[in-house]
Amino acid sequence: MKRRSFIKTSAAGLVAPTALVSNDSKPIKNRVRKPIVISTWNHGLPANYAAMAILRQNGSALDAVEVGVRVPEADPESQSVGYGGRHDKDGHVTLDACIMDSFGNAGAVAFLKDIKHPISVARKVMEQTDHVMLVGKGAKKFALAHGFEEENLLTKKARDEWLRWKEDHSIKDSW
């Protein structure tokens, strides 16, 4: 479900019951079907579909979140996270991710290089350490120790964009 549709439906669902109340009120059936997965942007819809597939098979919400986030992390066309993601000023793709379960346990990684699925590393941090967040070299060392593969995440397209940026970055931005 797209975010705008969800908000419109939810807002109507909140207002409508108050308009229908009378002296002989009867329970109003909740029309919201659960579970639901929403995205802010259209490029998030493939992640929603993957997450919903997990939920429809009675998988956990935590599994659905991880599987859903892995979709854009693996999509070089997304360029928001993961493989083919935006580079830093030195041409490195550095990634962050965090995840939380229904009990309030959390795991996160930041400034993680060369690991395609930081969401899965963040989950490992949550489930297998006493830490909430690992950063940089420590996060990468942890990921490699837990079987994650080192990969070059800078695609040709992203590298070409970085080279173009590098040529004129002082003129067009605040670096």
Residue ranges and their predicted role:
Residues 14-22:
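Hydrophobic h-region of N-terminal signal peptides that target proteins for export
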Residues 10-11, 26-175:
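Alpha/propeptide regions of enzymes that mature by internal proteolysis
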